[in-house]
Amino acid sequence: MVPFGFRLLVAELPQHLGKHTQALDRLNALLRTCNQIIKNLNNGLSEDGSNLEMTNNMRDDSLKLWRTRRHRVMYSITNCAVSLKDFRLAGSLIERLIQEDPNSAAGLYSALGRLCLQLGDVTAAQETFNQYFEHSLPPPHHDPVQGLLHSAYVSIAQNAFKDAAEILQQAHKINPSNGLVINNYGVCLMYTGRVSEAIALVEGAVFSQPERFLHEAIVLNLATMYELESSNAHQKKLKILSLIAQHKGDSFNVAALKLQPQ
């Protein structure tokens, strides 16, 4: 008997090797299995479709388990669709998950709003971000930083980088160790011509907590900032490369540094 988590991992692995279509095929096959088992249980049969007797409690527990597994597969398919930049497929899956997994609605609306921005639909993004607030826990239990990030994303989509920087400055004061805030705040500072401030912000985070902040997106943006700041960018990139070697190893895609042969 192969554990479900292992089957899901096997289905996801091709995505990490750049074989997204193969991953989607495997994940969809796994989703069909989940759907068939749920259908069998709803029709009064056992999981495998036989007439094996099950108590009501056993059936309810099994349905709950397989619905949860179905959601896990749908989340994986969504991630794969985003990697393929198939934002419409990802959006339709998230909308289905909102209906089926209402406890996760706030986070799902946040993700859906970001997808709307990827599609260039700022109005839909704003409406979706409003849904995030409606489904979040009431103050003081919800995270105010997430709402500020949403506002900043909308400003960035409208090329209002100065406004976005001001919003992200507020978010940074609330949570100075939030990687999304640091990365986006740095980018906005860069686009408003405050490159030195952007470098100080992002570089400070990377060197103070490399295990936490050495992400490819952050490193890529930092490399761009170095290139804009001075002709000494290569040496600074090498310092980041050394940090990556110490804390991340071979799994890190060093192409993010944009190193050129000297």
Show the residue positions of the predicted features:
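Helix-rich alpha-solenoid scaffolding regions
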Residues: 1-18
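Generic helix N-cap/helix-start motif at coil->alpha-helix transitions
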Residues: 2-6, 65-74, 101-109, 139-148, ...
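Flexible helix-coil transition and linker loops at the boundaries of alpha-helical arrays
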Residues: 1, 35-67, 97-102, 135-141
